[in-house]
């Protein structure tokens, strides 16, 4: 089920948490009803989710105090610049594996705390909670009994120390974020409670949680050190399993937790591209060059050569390996021979060029992939001359 995206200001991206919850519950009930018809039982469920997307809600009522600020959102760009001027980047990166960027949850939390109408009141009464989408869904499914997350999601907040597996008190202090609003961090496979019977009709245990990109790598069986998955959806994300050893990239890739089992981390290197399928959405919904996403494949294959038109889809800044939140989109190479199809093709090709940058960074870090597994959840078949 698709839910609406909101763009209240330039560079801002939001979701309605209640829509996230209602569509999730609708999908779950559909599966439960199907299982009943087949006379089967659902033994357990797992959750995979957008990782950095940030929600704060009222502990007593369960109502969000602001819309979910989505991972693509850029509103905290100036605050991130301030943190960099204070020379926090190296310290933050050594602890969290991340660069200071609006992409991650920490500065989004800070923004809601500073701008939410009832943030201070709820903090004072200990009635304010934070969570990424997994935490919010667990809270709702268990009817407020569990305030939990797991390691792969926690590692994307820019608040979690991936060396000692704890919320980092020094970073929290520097950002003035109270630890009491943060969830407990569990293993990726663990006891996350049970769904409330009044909500789902049956009690079902929740026994696994994993961030969406880590989950995609797990689903592609990237269990061996050096195995890579490259996923193309709204954004595009390349993850390499680096095993139990944390590797720090010299070429601006992220060091992150792949998963944690039995209190032991498996780490990964990740390159994040903010605009992949979202570029196709832009072609369809904003500039109206196509009516359906599927048209991009036919158009991209209609010509064997690029006619010199290039799109830099920095609609939400640039992710790895550039980390330029201030970057903006560019179309270049237009001539009188160029037409709308040139722009469509160039937008699709841009995903291939960005992917090359990520693989090139891994190569420069001296990391040789054992195998690359690519999967697309959108219409992003690259033209024949686009080499990754």
Show which residues each predicted segment covers.
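Short, acidic/turn-prone active-site loops that include or flank metal/cofactor-
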Residues: 1, 6, 69-76, 235-236
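N-terminally biased helix-coil "hinge/interface" segments that flank
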Residues: 1-2, 20, 24, 28, ...
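N-terminal glycine/serine-rich phosphate-binding loop of ATP-dependent small-molecule kinases
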Residues: 1-66, 94, 184, 200-208
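Short, conserved phosphate/pyrophosphate- and ester-handling motifs at nucleotide-, phospho-/glycolipid
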Residues: 16, 73, 212
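Short beta-strand-loop/turn "lid" adjacent to the catalytic site in phosphate-handling enzymes
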Residues: 35-71, 99-105, 134, 138-161, ...
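Active-site core segments that coordinate phosphate-bearing ligands/cofactors
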Residues: 77, 84-98, 103-147, 158-169, ...
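Short linear loop/turn motifs
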Residues: 182-191, 297-301
């Amino acid at each position: 089920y698709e839910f609406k995206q909101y763009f209240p200001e330039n560079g801002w991206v939001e979701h309605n948490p209640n829509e996230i919850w209602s569509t999730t519950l609708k999908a779950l009930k559909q599966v439960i009803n199907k299982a009943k018809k087949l006379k089967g039982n659902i033994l357990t469920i797992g959750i995979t989710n957008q990782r950095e997307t940030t929600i704060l809600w009222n502990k007593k009522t369960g109502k969000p105090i602001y819309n979910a600020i989505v991972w693509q959102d850029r509103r905290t760009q100036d605050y991130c610049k301030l943190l960099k001027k204070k020379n926090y980047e190296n310290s933050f990166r050594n602890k969290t594996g991340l660069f200071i960027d609006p992409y991650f949850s920490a500065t989004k939390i800070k923004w809601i705390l500073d701008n939410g109408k009832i943030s201070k009141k709820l903090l004072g009464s200990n009635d304010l909670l934070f969570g990424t989408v997994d935490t919010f869904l667990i809270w709702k499914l268990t009817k407020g009994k569990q305030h939990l997350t797991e390691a792969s999601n926690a590692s994307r907040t820019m608040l979690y120390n991936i060396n000692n597996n704890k919320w980092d008190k020094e970073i929290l202090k520097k950002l003035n974020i109270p630890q009491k609003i943060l969830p407990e961090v569990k293993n990726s496979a663990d006891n996350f409670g049970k769904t409330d019977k009044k909500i789902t009709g049956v009690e079902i245990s929740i026994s696994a949680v994993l961030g969406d990109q880590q989950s995609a790598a797990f689903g592609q069986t990237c269990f061996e050190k050096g195995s890579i998955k490259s996923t193309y959806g709204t954004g595009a994300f390349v993850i390499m399993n680096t095993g139990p050893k944390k590797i720090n990239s010299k070429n601006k890739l992220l060091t992150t937790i792949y998963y944690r089992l039995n209190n032991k981390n498996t780490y990964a290197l990740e390159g994040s591209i903010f605009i992949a399928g979202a570029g196709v959405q832009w072609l369809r919904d904003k500039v109206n060059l196509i009516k359906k996403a599927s048209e991009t494949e036919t158009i991209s294959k209609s010509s064997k050569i690029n006619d010199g038109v290039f799109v830099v889809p920095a609609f939400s800044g640039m992710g790895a390996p550039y980390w330029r939140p201030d970057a903006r989109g560019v179309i270049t190479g237009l001539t009188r021979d160029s037409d709308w199809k040139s722009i469509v093709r160039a937008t699709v090709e841009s995903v291939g060029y960005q992917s090359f940058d990520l693989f090139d960074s891994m190569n420069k870090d001296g990391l040789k992939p054992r195998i690359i597994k690519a999967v697309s959840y959108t219409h992003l078949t690259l033209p024949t001359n686009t080499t990754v």
